[in-house]
Every structure is written in structure tokens, then in C-alpha cells.
Amino acid sequence: PLNRDMSHPESRKITSMLLGGALADSLRGKTIDRICNQNDWPAMLLSQLNLPTTKFSWSKNILDPAAVEFAYYSNENCLGWITPHKNYVYSYASGTIEELKGIQDSTGSQTAAIQAKAYLQTLYQTYLGY
């Protein structure tokens, strides 16, 4: 969108609206500005309906203030890791990590790289198990 580089997190922002009776009255008309992935929707919606979320191990209830905010994305060129404090993009071609938001911090970059790699490895291993 808007000629943005699809490797950058700004190209991944999507505005969503929740409508209907499942949403708690206390949340109606509210803006929820939390970082999440589309796979977080099942846990969020099922929690609103007081239904179990255990079958959706990759999902988190973003309406729960204790839920850790992060988003992951990948394409043929990169792996992106988005947190409230920093956004990182790992380039497959160059093998480098680019910090796109936040204070430059090599320790933070390495921690984010480890988290993103662990997430991707676990995701891939789960996929292979199907």
C-alpha cells in the first residue's frame, strides 16, 4: 500500500473492526491499539465467548493486558519481528538485522533475532508434524 516496501512493518498494518454480540459491552466503541497477528484472533474471539482456546496454541488474547505484544511476518526477502518498542527486519540476502524503530541497541537486536528464529523454528517444526 502507498508504494511501501513490503519488507517493512508499516506495510503490514491493518485496521480491523469487531462487530456483533460476542464483544463485551465494556469494549464496545473502544480503540484497541495492540500489536498482534491474524492468528491471535481465535483466542481473542473465543475468550469473548467464554470458550476454550487450547486448540489455538499459536493464538493469544490481545484483549488480555497480560498478553505479550509482538507480531511476526516473513516473505521471500525477509523476516520481520515487531514489538511495542522496536521493529526489526532480518534480510535473508545480506544476513543483517535492521532496526526500524527504537533506540539502536545491538543486544536488543540479538535478543530479537533469537526470539524470531525460535518462533520460526517452532512454527516450522509444528508444520512438519501435520
Give the location of each predicted region:
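Solvent-exposed soluble domains appended to multi-pass membrane proteins
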Residues: 1-130
